[in-house]
């Protein structure tokens, strides 16, 4: 979904939850939640070290204190490009899969400084699946899939009818979808 508005709120201008909103929902709610975002490593403030840990180097300037980390809600990049997959969760651990193959399990307790679980993944088309778990018990899941060639516009309205009084409003969300209805 395209970014609409500033990057310092929990919601954008039209009410869509931002990455920051998903992150804080994981911290503040008891309902199990897992959310995936991605960013090419070369554009990220996080870099993977030789030992597999991550170093954070914030952008300079005062505005960085207000903005959230650059991320995207998509899984479509150049083949073999190094992508940082970030997972927000309130589960004790997350297992990440790419096209059904496990990329490993990470514990939230190992990422306490930023509370963001991270993997460096060479991009391949398909589906990322993050499974939030407590031992063998699955608590929550999230997926990102590679979108195909755009083939249709999908409309979603928050209301079906309006009164002709000059005060009613209907929000219409337009998305571009492929044959599998992936945005």
Each PLM stretch: what is its role?
Residues 166-172:
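Short, solvent-exposed loop/turn segments enriched in Ser/Thr/Gly
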Residues 1-166, 179-183:
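Substrate-binding clefts and catalytic carboxylate motifs of secreted carbohydrate-active enzymes
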């Amino acid at each position: 979904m395209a970014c609409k508005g500033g990057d310092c709120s929990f919601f954008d201008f039209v009410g869509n939850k931002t990455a920051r909103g998903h992150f804080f929902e994981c911290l503040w709610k008891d309902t199990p939640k897992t959310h995936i975002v991605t960013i090419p490593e070369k554009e990220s403030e996080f870099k993977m070290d030789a030992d597999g840990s991550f170093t954070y180097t914030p952008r300079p300037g005062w505005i960085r204190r207000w903005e959230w980390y650059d991320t995207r809600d998509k899984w479509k990049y150049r083949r073999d490009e190094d992508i940082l997959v970030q997972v927000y969760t309130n589960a004790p651990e997350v297992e990440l899969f790419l096209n059904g193959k496990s990329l490993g399990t990470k514990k939230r307790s190992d990422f306490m400084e930023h509370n963001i679980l991270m993997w460096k993944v060479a991009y391949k088309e398909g589906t990322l699946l993050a499974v939030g778990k407590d031992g063998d018990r699955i608590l929550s899941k999230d997926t990102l899939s590679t979108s195909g060639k755009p083939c249709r516009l999908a409309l979603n309205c928050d209301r079906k009818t309006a009164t002709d009084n000059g005060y009613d409003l209907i929000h219409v969300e337009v998305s571009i979808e492929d044959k599998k209805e992936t945005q």
